[in-house]
Amino acid sequence: MAGYNLEAIEAAPLKDDLDIVIPTIRSLDFLEQWRPFLHHYHLIIVQDGDPSIKIRVPEGYDYELYNRNDINRILGPRANCISYKDGGCRCFGFMVSKKKYIYTIDDDCFVAKDPSGKDINVIAQHIKNLETPSTPHYFNTLYDPFRDGTDFVRGYPFSLREGVQTAISHGLWLNIPDYDAPTQLVKPRERNTRYVDAVMTIPKRVLYPMCGMNLAFNRELVGPAMYFGLMGEGQPISRYDDMWAGWAAKVVCDHLGFGVKTGLPYLWHSKASNPFVNLKKEHKGLHWQEDMVPFFQNLRLSKESDTAAKCYMEISNMTKEKLTKVDPYFEKLADAMVVWIEAWEELNPPVKKKQSDGKDVKAK
């Protein structure tokens, strides 16, 4: 697409602008296979579970490693907003990062190959997705018009062809599908072998089930909305952390005028989790999602919510107002959402800019 040098975007690793966040409870030997693509980048590793267990990181990586003791030390009483024994702990890494972009990956994911047999560079594709516009207001039947070899089709309004800034790039996976427990039980041997060479913008006012295992986003645009909820040990629900963040962040993107892409890149998901354990973690969520999804579908934010943080505070208020009748847990979740924003703003104070008279004002 004219005006966007896709080769330059792919060639530029943006290593000074992107952090890789990895939640883990085990050895990070999987990083050996990722070395050709990830070794240039700074890693933020969030160790879940027992902080006395030593996590081994392969040599040569530049990283910070945080365990639960570190989270408690840094956040103090606000640490209770970070999930324990749940992949949602990764959002602590989003909070302490200072980079423009975040890429988060699970520790059971490996490099996949495209149909030609070439290793897939997930970072390059995510950066390409994030650095080119989204088209949420009108669907292009050739999918992403900013990819090489495609464009806007006949009938696409010229007034909408500029697109909007992309905030989220949602990648996919080969091999083990990201299924809920009932589907896992019905299809225990099913594998995803279909490689679809496509990137598309999720239309405005349309939700999607966001998976955190292969995800990149613009932290400056939507970082405060990427809260993976209060789940795991001590909570009645788990395995909905990424979906909660995805629903909320999509509402924020729609309100603020940003876009969300899904599709390429693929990675290889190697390890199927136990469906019986998952069923115990998910069983309330499987019922509650019938209320959570309509809640987010019907959310409309006020014009006063002009930043991701303000949007998220408003969503917190509506969560308490609308979802507490489903279960008292949602009041606790809504309170944790407020604490999350307070902690975010403590570690990431709003940047001040100068007015014409030289006085400081908070940047929006």
UniProtKB/Swiss-Prot annotation:
Glycans are attached at residue 154. It comes from the Eukaryota. The keyword Cytoplasm applies. Belongs to the RGP family. This is Probable UDP-arabinopyranose mutase 4. It comes from Arabidopsis thaliana. Its EC number is 5.4.99.30. It catalyses: UDP-beta-L-arabinofuranose = UDP-beta-L-arabinopyranose. GO terms for cellular component: cytosol; Golgi apparatus; plastid.
